[in-house]
Amino acid sequence: ICEQVGEQPVKGIFPRKVVRVVTPGTVTEPGLLPGDANNYLASVILDTTTAVNSNPITASVSYVDITTGEFAVTELPLEALRAELTRLHPAEIIHPDSQVLPDGITGHITALPAWKFEPGKCSEVLISHFKASTLAGFGLKDNSLSARAAGAIVQYLKETQPDALNLLTSLRAYSLNEFMTLDASTRRNLELDETLRGERKGSLLGTLDFSVTPMGKRLMHQWVSQPLLHVAKITQRQNGVQYFVENGMVRAELRATLKPLADLERLVNRVLAGQAQPRDLVAMRATLTELPKIKEVISGQKAVVSDQWSVCTQELSLLQNAIDDDPPATLQNTGVIRPGYSSELDGVIDASKHARDWIANLEGVEREKTGIKTLKVGYNKVFGYYIEISRGAADKAPESYIRKQTLVNAERFITPEMKEYETLVLNAEERIKEIETRLFREVCAELVKAANQILATARAIAELDVLSALGEAAALGGYTRPEVHEGSGLEIHEGRHPVVEQLLKSDRYIPNDVIFEKGEVVRVITGPNMSGKSTYLRQTALIVLMAQMGSFVPAASAKIGLVDRIFTRIGAQDEIHAGQSTFMVEMVEAANILHHATPRSLLILDEIGRGTSTYDGLSIAWGIIEYIHNHPQLRAKTLFATHYHELTQLADLLPGIRNYNVAVSEADNKVVFLHKIIAGGADRSYGIHVGQLAGLPAPVIQRATEIMAELEKTSGRAVKIDPNAAQQVALFPETNPLLDELKELDVNSLSPIEALNKLFEWR
């Protein structure tokens, strides 16, 4: 952004200079920012010092939101980089131009000279910025990969938004081990913050987010994106939610009080960055005014939120005394400071008003004093204020009048006293602007001193907003408090899908249980199309996620052992830009799951193998289930929905596999899907019935029914097991009765008629 500087020259154009560089990650204007989400600038660097075969295995990510002051850094395996960036969804990513970011990382990417990520320089920048002697106090080692990522951000801000550096008062080093891991595929498949169509409504966030403040909405997004892995922290959040569930009147009163609050977090940071305008302080004052009421509403409830935050009495008093109730939008206009705050300013304003009144009354006073009826007072830009008398009466002008201009029909005069008042009037507005600007800056300077205190208050308000919002969601949705523990069990009674049940306005949602018994590893779920298998899988994952973010869950009851990762393989999607088919995408995601899942993970696998031929798909699905069950370092709790009914045979072979299916009612040639998960395997998918429901023409349905009957008569369904094959199961019949009979037949002894009869018999 270039602005005019200096005075307008006699010739030529105004001199200009670059006053600011704007990039996607350094925007601060409220109109350009998403109110309910952070605007992150991320820095990414790969660790080439520990590369294997020239391939880095470690990376560091640092991110900052200069509108809130959030500044953090972590080191992570390269394979987790995409998932972390997906969670952050940064507006801009900077990285060294000497490195190539892994595939799949998209967005606004800015490559910077590699020297800006140099270890010594970056550490020095951080130490200098935080006025520290070492980075150990921030949990970092000098010259470490994390220091390079964070230091590069500080250097970038120096070039683009130097005022924003005041906002960076701390740096938080975090570990991925603090939060549940959710890769990009899982976030998409579970529709955490947006649906597959890119809409917020219909997502988990859209269902749970009853928050009413901008700070609360950003924090809610973080909680949904980062479920916790510490039972104590989860319990603390649950305590807060429970309080608001049980105290509906308090919840309603608090939410009504919070609703009109401004974005205190971003207002403070605009003050810190020197970008605050008068109406920003009015909004801050209105918000601070509500703090005593908020604190009174939750008085004594330490289980809800810490009571260490301040009601900012001094800051509120300052804003009430200093800033006018209805100031102009910018400091370019007067009326910012409240009358009575500054005697100096009041004196100038009074003098200006007195001068204007004196000049306004001057014409009548002078006419009466001189008796000249044609006397009048005027103004122009050349001479300023003047007294004009007609030529015929000019000789009656008092001696105190000083002739200034002679016209054809009049003479113009000034007086010393008039010029004094003129100076007061003409200079007063600029003088008022000057004083108001100085006073405004002084008020902002006092707020800067209290910035940390106000920001702590903003964070407390955000947490209150989220807890009360989750309480609202729980009360409206009939959610219950889950028991989250350090064990490995998973027990959900009458679980429901939190989003789908809200969309089923007229129909009652059918709840289902998920109870993994001791030793149970994989649930193979078969059943008709459109019967609810995929919904059942997703609701299980969402209930676990909600429990670990601290929310209540849509279930009659739930006991959930900590889950470190949720993996999903759901749906068919081509990665055309990467040259990958539907089946290749499916296999890549399945491989990722098998390589990175742990015994504490939850695997949601829907229709694995359907992207290829039946035999290939069945073989792969079979092998995957065996691998999950048998691998000693895997054995993750798995829900495996499939149309391959042959997979139900695995329950007879492997002790940790159970069969379940979706109940169907058949009567009078009608099929009704009951949406209830029951024990046992299904032997039909009712695909033709679904086609009929979808409106396929009757001849198509009739012909499909005939073909299905023929196929069922001729297909071999038996699965034979070799008990000595170390679980390498033969999926299909090893011999065919027809082939055996053909081998035993002596074709040389058959007559032509006998041969034709045999063919007719085998038809």
Enumerate the language-model features and the residues they cover.
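C-terminal tails and terminal domains of large nucleic-acid-associated
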Residues: 735-763
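Charged, surface-exposed helical/loop "interaction arms" that form contiguous linear patches used
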Residues: 273, 277, 287-290, 339-340, ...
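Flexible, glycine/threonine-enriched loop-and-boundary segments that flank and lead into catalytic domains
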Residues: 357-377, 478-480, 497, 505
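Extended, charged coiled-coil "arm/hinge" scaffolds of SMC/Rad50-like chromosome-maintenance ATPases
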Residues: 407, 411-445
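ATPase nucleotide-binding head domains, primarily ABC-like/P-loop NTPase cores
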Residues: 143, 212, 223, 390-422, ...
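Amphipathic alpha-helical
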Residues: 1-17, 460-468, 475, 641
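Charged catalytic and DNA/RNA-contacting regions of genome-maintenance
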Residues: 1-243, 252, 256-259, 263-272, ...
